[in-house]
Curated annotation (Swiss-Prot):
GO BP terms: translation
Lineage: Bacteria, Pseudomonadati, Pseudomonadota, Gammaproteobacteria, Enterobacterales
Family stated for the protein in its record: Belongs to the bacterial ribosomal protein bL25 family.
Keyword Transferase: no
Keyword Cell inner membrane in record: no
The protein's name: Large ribosomal subunit protein bL25
GO (cellular component) term, any one: cytosolic large ribosomal subunit
Length: 96
């Protein structure tokens, strides 16, 4: 199982997302199963290297947010049109 570390993101919007990407981070969202969505940020290089593996999309992942573990699956990934960059990831809760 892959482990992805994330932090809760308080600010939202295009300008904040751009600032995150300058710091080699990117935004994401965790949602599903009647839970309130959690806005998160992740380290770009860590996730970029993990997503190169095919199992990243097939298996459930462990998302660590403030020492709390969430079992999730990748729902959608937005990538830059011509740069090797991830712009945003949507995760959904996974039932075990």
């Amino acid at each position: 199982m892959f482990i992805v570390k994330a932090e809760i993101r308080d600010k939202k919007g295009k300008s904040f997302s751009r600032k995150l990407r300058i710091e080699d981070k990117f935004p994401g969202v965790l949602y599903g199963f009647n839970n309130t969505p959690i806005s998160i940020t992740m380290d770009h290089n860590l996730v970029f290297n993990l997503q190169k593996k095919e199992d990243f999309y097939k298996e459930t992942l462990c998302l660590l947010i403030k020492e709390k573990k969430y079992t999730v699956k990748v729902h959608a990934i937005q990538r830059h049109a011509f740069k090797m960059k991830i712009l945003h990831i949507d995760f959904i809760y996974a039932k075990i």
